[in-house]
Amino acid sequence: MPRHGVSPGQGLPRSGREQASDRSLGAPCLRLLWLGLALALALPNSPVLWSPAEARPLPTQGHPAKFIRIAPQLQEAFGWWNLTCPTCKGLFTAIDFGLRNQASVAWVGSVAIKLCVLLKIAPPAVCQSAVQLFEDDMVEVWTRSVLSPSEACGLLLGSSCGHWDIFSSWNISLPAVPKPPPQPPKPPAPGSPVSRVLFLTDLHWDHDYLEGTDPNCENPLCCRRDSGPPPASQPGAGYWGEYSKCDLPLRTLESLLSGLGPAGPFDMVYWTGDIPAHNIWQQSRQDQLRALTTITALVKKFLGPVPVYPAVGNHESTPVNGFPPPFIKGNQSSHWLYEAMAEAWEPWLPAEALRTLRIGGFYALSPRPGLRLISLNMNFCSRENFWLLINSTDPAGQLQWLVGELQAAEDRGDKVHIIGHIPPGHCLKSWSWNYYRIVERYENTLAGQFFGHTHVDEFEVFYDEETLSRPLSVAFLAPSATTYIGLNPGYRVYQIDGNYSGSSHVVLDHETYIMNLTEANEPGATPHWYLLYRARETYGLPNALPTAWHDLVYRMRKDTQLFQTFWFLYHKGHPPSEPCGTPCRLATLCAQLSARSDSPALCRHLVPDASLPDVQSLWSMPLLC
C-alpha cells in the first residue's frame, strides 16, 4: 500500500505550478510531428512560397482540393494537443494536392514550416526542425501509398473518422493442428522455486536535462538546456526529475539501476524499449545510437551477469515511429538501427535471435528449459508507424512467424513469454484482432505477456472469442521509468513460477517500485527507491491469473474506494489533481478489458445501461510518441 501516510485518494503533493492539463500534452505528440509534414503540401498558390535552387523531383499523384478554404478555421481551432478529424482530412487532401502540383521535397518543407507556425501547431523552432526531420520519409510514404485522405485519417484516428479497410481484410493462417482443451495453470506446490524478473520500460534518457530550467516551457519537452529559466515566481526543474513534461537525467537512471539491491536478486530482465527522450523534432540517427549504447552500457554495468532480453520501442528510430517493413531498402530502411541493436545486445542474445533482430527487430530464444521467450517488434502494429500506409498486412511476416514459434513450443510442451513495447489493445485493428486470435489458440502455451508504452500501471484481459466471457490470458502493462508526464519514476518486478520441471512459468505476483520526486528533490536529500505496492496484497487477489484480473475490474466498478486505490497506483503514486468521476472510472475500467482494439463488445457487461461507443470514447488511449 502507499507509504508516508498518503492516502490513495489524495496522492502525493503537487507543485503549485503544475497545470491540470499537463498530463494530456504528451498523448498526441507523435501525430503533431506527423502533422508538420502533412501541412507541407497545403496552400500551393500562397504568396509566402519560395522555390529553393536545389529542388529534388517528386512523383505526381493526388486528389485536388482547396485546402486554403479551411485554413482560417484550422488557425482558430487547432492547438498543439488537438488534431481533429476534419483537420486530418484537410491535411491529407492537401498532401495529394501538393504532390500533384509541385515538384520538390524542399518546396514541400518550406510550406510546412510556414503553415506550422501560422496555425500555431508548435513553436517556430520546433516547426522548422520537425518538418526537416520528417519530410523525406513522409513524402516517400505518401507517394507510395494508395490511401485516400479519408482512409488515411481512419487509419490514424480510428473508424469514427474514416472508413479504412484497404488493408484490413487479412488473416493469419493457423496450423491445422486441433486446439487442445483449455487447461488453466495449477498453483505451484508450496516451496516451489520462484523467479524474480526485473521489468524496465520507457527509460527516456534526456541527454540535455538541466536542473533549474523551465519545466513548463512552450516546447513539447522541457527541463532542458534550451527550455530557458522559469518565471521568477516559479521553481525550476528538480535535480532528479520533475512532475511535468520532462524526461530523466542520466543520474536518475543510474540511481535506479544502482539501487535495485532490495528488490533483487533477479533471474533475468525484460526491457521493453523507449530509450531516447521525447525531443522528437530534433533527433538524428547519431543521437538515437548514442542513447542506445549509453543506456545499454549502463544496464550491463549495474546488472552484470544477469541476462537481459530487450524489445524495440517506438522511440528508438528517427523519425519517431518510423519503422519500415523489410521490403524498404537502402538508406530509408531500419538496417542502421537493427544492426546497432544486434551489436549492443550480442552478449545477451544467441545467433538465431540476432539474425531475426537484424531482419525485423524481433526474435525468440530459450532463457531456460521449458520456457521460450518471444520479443515482438510492436511498431509493426502501430497506428503511428507511417510506413504502414504503404502496406499494413502482417509487416515482416511477424505474426505468421509468431504462430510458428507458438506451435513449435506447443509441440515440445514448452511455455512462452511474450514481451513487446506497444500493448496489443493499442494496435491497428486487423493486427490486434489477429493477435487476439493467436492468443486464444495458444492459451495453454502462453504463460505471460509483458508490455510498456503507456507510462502508467495497467493490464489488458483476453477472452475466448466465441463468448467474450471466459478470461484466458492477461497482458501486464508496466509503468515507466520516466516521469513524462507528471509521474514518479518507477520500475516493476514480476514473481514468476520458477525454474523446475513442470513449472507453469505464470506470473504469481508483481511489485512496483518508485522514487518519490517530492522527497528526492528536497535540499540535501538523497534518492530512495521504495516498494509502492504488491498486486495481490493490495487488491486482495487469490492469484495473478486472468480470472482474478477480470474479477478485479468488476469489483472496482462497484467499489469506488478500491478504484481510487487503483487510480493512485495507476499513476505511480502521483495522480492528477482533477478527480476521476464515474465516466472516467468506467472508461478506465473498459481499457483494462480491451486487449483487442475497436471492440466495444468487450465492455458490454461493464456498462450495460450506457452507450458503449460513448463510454469507449472517454478512454483517451495514451498515444505517447
Curated annotation (Swiss-Prot):
Residues 1-20 are annotated as: Disordered. Disulfide bonds join C85-C161, C88-C153, C116-C127, C217-C222, C223-C246, C381-C427, C580-C584, C590-C603. The keyword Ribosomal protein does not apply. It catalyses: a sphingomyelin + H2O = phosphocholine + an N-acylsphing-4-enine + H(+); N-(octadecanoyl)-sphing-4-enine-1-phosphocholine + H2O = N-octadecanoylsphing-4-enine + phosphocholine + H(+); a 1,2-diacyl-sn-glycero-3-phosphocholine + H2O = phosphocholine + a 1,2-diacyl-sn-glycerol + H(+); 1,2-dihexadecanoyl-sn-glycero-3-phosphocholine + H2O = 1,2-dihexadecanoyl-sn-glycerol + phosphocholine + H(+). Glycans are attached at N82, N171, N331, N391, N499, N516. GO terms for biological process: cellular response to calcium ion; cellular response to UV; ceramide biosynthetic process; cholesterol metabolic process; negative regulation of MAPK cascade; plasma membrane repair; positive regulation of apoptotic process; positive regulation of endocytosis. Residues 1-40 form the signal peptide. GO terms for cellular component: endolysosome; extracellular space; lipid droplet; lysosomal membrane; lysosome; membrane raft; plasma membrane. This is Sphingomyelin phosphodiesterase.
